[in-house]
């Protein structure tokens, strides 16, 4: 009889531990799911839809200079990675990779045009992402700082709108680029 009691006691303790763990998981899981499910996922291979996009008038910035062109996005955990391949002035393709942390902390990216510092922040509802960037460049021996603000919004699962505003000593230029998911 003593043997059966010990066995029951062991099972009872194990059972209580399992119940406690289950209760904790039931309470934590919805919070974790809501935190992840509430944020837009921009991952995909995106192609510029020139017909739906709006570029600045004149020669102030073609689609390529205002963030246009095709790009690939991966969004894993707390990192948004944007890979763009463009044709350079020499006709050769060049690839640039920008990484942004999605927690409101500063990200630093380096390119042939200089170092950029960016902060990405989510809207309160998690449906849009704003990326504010500051880049200092040397142009013809003169140091210039350009600031940009991009707002990324998924209009549906196959369409991404990126609204861009760039400020420089020459003024502000705005563009709206619409992308279709491949």
Can you name each region flagged by the protein language model?
Residues 35-182:
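Hydrophobic small-molecule pocket/channel-lining residues, especially in calycin-type beta-barrels
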Residues 9-10, 18, 101, 180:
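Compositionally biased, intrinsically disordered low-complexity regions enriched in proline and serine
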Residues 10-12, 25, 94:
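Generic hydrophobic-segment detector
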Residues 17-30:
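Bacterial N-terminal signal peptides
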Residues 1-16:
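N-terminal secretory signal peptides that target proteins for export/translocation
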């Amino acid at each position: 009889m003593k043997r059966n009691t010990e066995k029951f006691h062991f099972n009872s303790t194990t059972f209580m531990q399992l119940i406690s763990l289950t209760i904790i998981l039931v309470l934590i899981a919805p919070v974790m799911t809501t935190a992840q499910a509430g944020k837009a996922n921009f991952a995909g291979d995106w192609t510029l839809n020139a017909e739906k996009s709006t570029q600045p008038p004149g020669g102030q910035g073609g689609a390529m200079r205002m963030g246009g062109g095709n790009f690939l996005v991966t969004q894993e955990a707390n990192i948004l990675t944007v890979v763009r391949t463009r044709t350079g002035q020499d006709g050769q393709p060049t690839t640039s990779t920008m990484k942004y942390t999605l927690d409101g902390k500063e990200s630093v990216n380096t390119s042939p045009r200089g170092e950029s510092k960016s902060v990405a922040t989510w809207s309160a509802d998690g449906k849009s992402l704003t990326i504010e960037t500051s880049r200092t460049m040397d142009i013809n021996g003169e140091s210039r700082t350009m600031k940009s603000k991009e707002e990324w919004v998924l209009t549906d699962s196959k369409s991404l709108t990126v609204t861009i505003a760039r400020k420089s000593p020459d003024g502000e230029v705005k563009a709206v680029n619409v992308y279709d998911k491949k």
